[in-house]
Swiss-Prot record:
GO molecular function (one): sequence-specific DNA binding
InterPro entries referenced in this protein's UniProt entry, alphabetically: Fork_head_dom, FOX_domain-containing, TF_fork_head_CS_1, TF_fork_head_CS_2, WH-like_DNA-bd_sf, WH_DNA-bd_sf
Region entry Disordered, spans: 110-141, 195-237
Organism superkingdom: Eukaryota
Name the UniProt record assigns to this protein: Protein lin-31
Taxonomic classification: Eukaryota, Metazoa, Ecdysozoa, Nematoda, Chromadorea
Length: 237
């Protein structure tokens, strides 16, 4: 079937997108700008296909016109009666319509440095790949080991990091994950470092490995802290 000529589409749908139809209507006008009603009239006068189902295609054209940056809206002057603003082609969008060819689909013009999108009858902005509801995953916190604890608090007694992280009876190959808030108590440990040092058994390593006697004494919280340690002392510090 031969392809219809430029002005002989009759009832067939012309191979132009709504963006190209709008461009042709504006460029054929004397002032290079038209109100929306005149754009509709131009299309219906030139292409009989658009004389039916006018509400459907006019809504689609208006949607594309509003969201495509290659067209700019110009307020109607006071000396020109009528309703609605005028539409014109953006000065920087002339490259989209080079050679006067409106048959080919070209990339959508973005006036503010955005990415180009393909021109379709309906244009919907692409959703953001990074959503506030789906933030980037947080990196896992590293386990706190005795060397790390000693480096953070160099004034701690030598036996305190091992005792805090590996209580008697616990497998020394498995490190504990301390709550960061628990490190706030370290200054209170330092106040009683002498009492804690004296109450910590020297055979601590043997107790951890399980080779020590069951009668070995395990240091208790009361032995490591004096009676002045309380919740009030934490809050007042």
């Amino acid at each position: 079937m031969p392809r219809p000529g430029k002005d002989s589409y009759d009832e067939q749908k012309p191979p132009y997108s709504y963006i190209w139809l709008t461009y042709m209507a504006i460029q054929d006008s004397d002032d290079k700008m038209l109100p929306l009603t005149e754009i509709y009239k131009y299309i219906m006068d030139r292409f009989p296909f658009y004389r039916k189902n006018t509400q459907r295609w006019q809504n689609s054209l208006r949607h594309n016109l509003s969201f495509n940056d290659c067209f700019i809206k110009i307020p109607r002057r006071a000396d020109r009666p009528g309703k609605g603003s005028y539409w014109a082609v953006h000065p920087n969008a002339s490259g989209m319509f080079e050679n006067g060819s409106c048959l080919r689909r070209r990339k959508r013009f973005r006036a503010r440095g955005g990415q180009d999108d393909d021109d379709d009858d309906f244009h919907h902005p692409a959703p953001s790949k990074i959503s506030r509801k789906n933030p980037l995953p947080l990196l896992p916190e590293p386990p706190i080991t005795p060397p790390l604890l000693s480096s953070l608090f160099p004034n701690l007694p030598p036996s305190l990091p091992n005792f805090c992280l590996f209580p008697p009876g616990m497998d020394p190959t498995k490190s504990l994950l301390l709550n960061p808030l628990s490190l706030l108590l370290m200054p209170h440990f330092l106040k009683n470092s002498s009492n804690f040092e004296s109450s910590t058994p020297h055979s601590e390593t043997s107790e951890i490995s399980g080779s020590g006697s069951s009668s070995s004494k395990t240091p208790t919280p009361e032995a490591g802290f004096n009676s002045s340690f309380s919740i009030e002392s934490i809050l007042s510090s």
